[in-house]
């Protein structure tokens, strides 16, 4: 039986050209007026998935 891609993970994580996994940071969708602007600035941009989670994420994406 073929492995299937976990669609929830596929929507949240992208694979770069070099094979790294990147994701958006949480806590920047709503209720922002109660959060300090320093915090919302710090949460900007994309970050690499931690090495502890990379193996599991790749398996969910069907890359390993």
Swiss-Prot record:
Where does the record place Basic residues bias?
Answer: 1-14
Q: Tell me the NCBIfam families matching this sequence.
A: rpmI_bact (TIGR00001)
- UniProt-listed PANTHER family: 54S RIBOSOMAL PROTEIN BL35M, LARGE RIBOSOMAL SUBUNIT PROTEIN BL35M
Q: Does the keyword Cell division apply?
A: no
Q: A single GO BP annotation from the record?
A: translation
SUPFAM superfamilies in UniProt: L35p-like
Which residue ranges have biased composition labelled Basic and acidic residues? 21-30
**A GO CC term attached to the entry:** cytosolic large ribosomal subunit
> Gene encoding this polypeptide?
rpmI
Task: Give the superkingdom in one word.
Answer: Bacteria
- Region feature (Disordered): 1-30
**What's the family?**
Belongs to the bacterial ribosomal protein bL35 family.
Q: Which Pfam families match?
A: Ribosomal_L35p
Keyword Transport assigned to the entry: answer is: no
Instruction: Supply the name of the protein.
Output: Large ribosomal subunit protein bL35
Keywords, sorted A to Z: Ribonucleoprotein, Ribosomal protein
Q: What lineage is this protein's organism placed in?
A: Bacteria, Bacillati, Actinomycetota, Actinomycetes, Mycobacteriales
This protein's species is Corynebacterium efficiens (strain DSM 44549 / YS-314 / AJ 12310 / JCM 11189 / NBRC 100395)
Question: Quick one: signal sequence residues?
Answer: none
GO molecular function terms noted in the UniProt entry: structural constituent of ribosome
């Amino acid at each position: 039986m073929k492995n299937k891609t976990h669609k929830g993970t596929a929507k949240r994580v992208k694979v770069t050209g070099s094979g790294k996994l990147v994701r958006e940071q949480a806590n920047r969708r709503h209720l922002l007026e109660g959060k300090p602007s320093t915090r919302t600035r710090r949460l900007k941009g994309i970050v690499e998935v931690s090495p502890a989670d990379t193996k599991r994420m790749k398996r969910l994406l069907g890359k390993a």
